């Protein structure tokens, strides 16, 4: 949930590395302030992302298949064990690295295990590379998503804790919030490091880009007295989205950063960054395109404002 990220104004220091990178290179790093998922769980969100928001259409396209047709070597690397995701998406890649084979919430595999895989892919001599990294992120159980003993928010009475007490959130939910925020702090390390290694050692005139977004959000106490997946509240759909590229300057326009964005349209933006060109292209769904035209997704919750 972007509301728990310091980069988006949260009161706890959950994203110090990303915030520092954005402050040092604001002209290269675009933070979309109003990003939404159209789904509150992983599989439908990924189906929409890679299927351009229409995965069940008669002439449905798949982003990975299109990239391979265009000459890209595609990697799928994941710390998220899910047989459906593997069968519907990962198997389309040229190279598949699955570092976690423990399904469900009990896995204690940390996302940092993927950093070596990213560096190996970046070092590959292929001329065109499309590297997809699927993290566990801050999925429950939150206490398993960061190294043991690395929770700086544990039992800290700060403004966030005080507000939750005022909201009469239970001790269990307050503990889950502490663990969720600690998971996001570790997530910040992994995500920022993936960006850092992408930025390193680029050859002259080599085009590189990096896109980060979540498949869905989480409820961790702001809307209801509970924590976890949340298809029934806004928190389940409020996500972060960041774009970095070394060959253009999308962040130069404040207008782009303030545009509402939906993850089921992300395929159009990634396809544009990859330089894919095909008859079914819809620039009005590409948030980086001047022709972009926002349409609210049909969510099962009432949203007061998509630009809040």
Q: What are the roles of these predicted feature ranges?
A:
Residues 1, 212-217:
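DG-centered beta-turn motif at the end of beta-strands
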Residues 1-162, 238, 263, 267-293:
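Active-site-proximal alpha/beta segments of enzymes that process anionic O-linked groups
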Residues 18, 22, 133, 148-150, ...:
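Proline/Glycine/Serine-rich low-complexity intrinsically disordered segments
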Residues 65, 196-206, 218-221, 229-232, ...:
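Membrane-interface soluble catalytic domains
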Residues 78, 214, 245:
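Short beta-strand/turn micro-motifs composed of small residues
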Residues 116-119, 158-210, 261, 265-267:
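A long, amphipathic alpha-helix that forms part
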Residues 130-134, 211-213, 242:
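Structural motif
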Residues 134, 139-140, 216, 226-229:
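Histidine-centered active-site/metal-ligand motif
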């Amino acid at each position: 949930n972007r509301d728990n990220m310091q980069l988006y104004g949260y009161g706890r220091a959950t994203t110090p590395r990303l915030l520092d990178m954005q402050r040092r290179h604001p002209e290269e790093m675009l933070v979309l302030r109003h990003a939404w998922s159209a789904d509150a769980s992983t599989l439908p969100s990924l189906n929409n992302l890679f299927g351009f928001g229409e995965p069940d259409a008669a002439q449905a396209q798949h982003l990975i298949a299109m990239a391979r047709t265009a000459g890209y070597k595609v990697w799928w690397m994941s710390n998220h064990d899910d047989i459906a995701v593997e069968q519907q998406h990962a198997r389309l890649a040229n190279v598949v690295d699955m570092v976690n084979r423990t399904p469900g919430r009990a896995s204690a595999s940390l996302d940092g295990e993927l950093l070596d895989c990213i560096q190996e892919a970046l070092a590959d001599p292929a001329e065109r590379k499309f590297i997809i990294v699927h993290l566990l992120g801050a999925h429950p159980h939150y206490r398993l998503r960061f190294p043991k003993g690395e929770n700086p928010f544990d039992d800290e009475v700060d403004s966030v804790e005080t507000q939750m007490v005022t909201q009469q959130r239970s001790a269990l939910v307050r503990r889950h919030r502490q663990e969720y925020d600690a998971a996001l702090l570790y997530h910040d390390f992994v995500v920022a490091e993936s960006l850092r290694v992408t930025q390193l050692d680029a050859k002259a005139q080599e085009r590189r880009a990096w896109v980060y977004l979540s498949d869905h959000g989480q409820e961790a106490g702001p809307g209801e007295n509970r924590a976890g997946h949340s298809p029934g509240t806004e928190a389940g759909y409020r996500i972060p989205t960041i774009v970095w590229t070394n060959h253009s300057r999308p962040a130069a326009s404040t207008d782009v950063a303030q545009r509402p964005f939906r993850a089921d349209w992300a395929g159009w933006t990634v396809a544009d960054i990859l330089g894919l060109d095909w008859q079914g292209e819809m620039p009005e769904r590409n948030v980086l395109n001047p022709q972009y035209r926002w349409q609210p997704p049909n969510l099962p919750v009432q949203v007061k404002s998509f630009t809040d």
